[in-house]
């Protein structure tokens, strides 16, 4: 049997058997992204008695309805109702969560290129220089909510900066812009993409005794595309744009011993995005709130200075 169901408006086809019913039967219900009120259930089958058994014929015995998967529940009085399974959110829901979680990872990957630039020019004398840095990283993310994804991120950052030296100190001031593209594969099927355009500024102060302070500010424009795989195998898609902004402050001390340098540091990073509302093609309405992240970090960077015969300098 096939049932047209609109849980959000409490409407559905119903199978009413006035007499005794015997046998095993399956009910097929169409998936939808529209969310009903929490805890809603809807009676689909009633019989006048007998040993009939009705189960949901959809793949896995579940149907996607809004945020949660629904199953066919035997009420014990010769009736069966469609009821939500709050233990399992739908694949579409996990994919929406995944897209929101991917943007801070994009921000961090882009920020790292500027942090690397500031680290590489410490103790280096120059006037003005242009630089570039490629991004090629992969992230695997899992969450307690049942959402998970793999992100492959590639991109390029271009920048220009100048160094101003004084008797005991020097400062660096620079600007940068960049682009990155993320391919995201969702653990429960489907995929997404994030195209990021970033612009920012940075500055650094360094004392000849090795003490330093660095700062970075940047803004991002994210173009997001999402293709969800529903439990029935169908695809729901959507797209939206969002904006992000963040800042990073780092302070530490740089010791140099011959060609080796050791740099312990303490850093703080903040990032936020604006909230966005969008609707998937299956009717699911996603209300994505502001993402806010504040992170403290302590670590040590160790590097070795190498001058190659062709004049190239490496410092891994």
Feature roles, as predicted:
Residues 1-42, 296, 302:
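Extracellular beta-strand/loop-rich repeat segments of large surface/secreted proteins
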Residues 4-6, 73-76, 89-97, 124-129, ...:
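Membrane translocator/pore-forming domains, dominated by Gram-negative outer-membrane beta-barrels
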Residues 4-5, 40-48, 54-151:
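Interface/linker segment at the passenger-translocator junction
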Residues 12-14, 113-118, 157-160:
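Short alpha-helical segments and helix-capping/turn motifs at coil-helix boundaries
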Residues 15, 27-28, 45, 54-56, ...:
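Generic preference for hydrophobic/aromatic residues in regular secondary structure cores
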Residues 25-30, 48, 54-56, 195, ...:
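A broad "ordered helical/assembly scaffold" signature
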């Amino acid at each position: 049997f096939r049932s047209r169901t609109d849980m959000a408006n409490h409407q559905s086809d119903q199978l009413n058997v006035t007499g005794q019913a015997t046998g095993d039967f399956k009910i097929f219900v169409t998936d939808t992204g529209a969310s009903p009120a929490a805890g809603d259930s809807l009676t689909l089958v009633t019989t006048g008695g007998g040993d009939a058994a009705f189960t949901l014929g959809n793949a896995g015995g579940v149907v996607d309805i809004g945020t949660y998967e629904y199953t066919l529940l035997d009420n014990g009085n010769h009736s069966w109702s469609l009821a939500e399974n709050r233990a399992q959110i739908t694949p579409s829901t996990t994919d929406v969560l995944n897209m929101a979680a991917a943007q801070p990872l994009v921000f961090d990957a882009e920020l790292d290129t500027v942090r690397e630039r500031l680290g590489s020019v410490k103790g280096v004398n120059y006037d003005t220089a242009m630089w570039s840095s490629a991004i090629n990283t992969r992230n695997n993310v899992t969450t307690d909510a049942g959402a998970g994804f793999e992100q492959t991120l590639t991109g390029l950052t271009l920048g220009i900066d100048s160094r101003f030296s004084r008797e005991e100190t020097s400062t660096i001031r620079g600007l940068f812009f960049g682009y990155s593209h993320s391919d995201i594969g969702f653990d429960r099927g489907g995929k997404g993409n994030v195209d990021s355009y970033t612009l920012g500024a940075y500055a650094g102060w360094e004392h000849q005794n090795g003490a330093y302070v660095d700062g970075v500010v940047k803004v991002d424009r994210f173009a997001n595309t999402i293709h969800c795989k529903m439990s029935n195998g169908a695809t729901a898609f959507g797209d939206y744009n969002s904006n992000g902004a963040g800042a990073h402050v780092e302070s530490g001390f740089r010791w140099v011993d011959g060609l080796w340098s050791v740099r312990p540091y303490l850093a703080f990073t903040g990032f936020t995005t604006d909230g966005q509302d969008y609707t998937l093609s299956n009717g699911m309405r996603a209300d994505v709130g502001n993402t806010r992240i504040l992170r403290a970090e302590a670590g040590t960077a160790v590097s070795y200075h190498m001058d190659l015969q062709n004049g190239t300098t490496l410092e891994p």
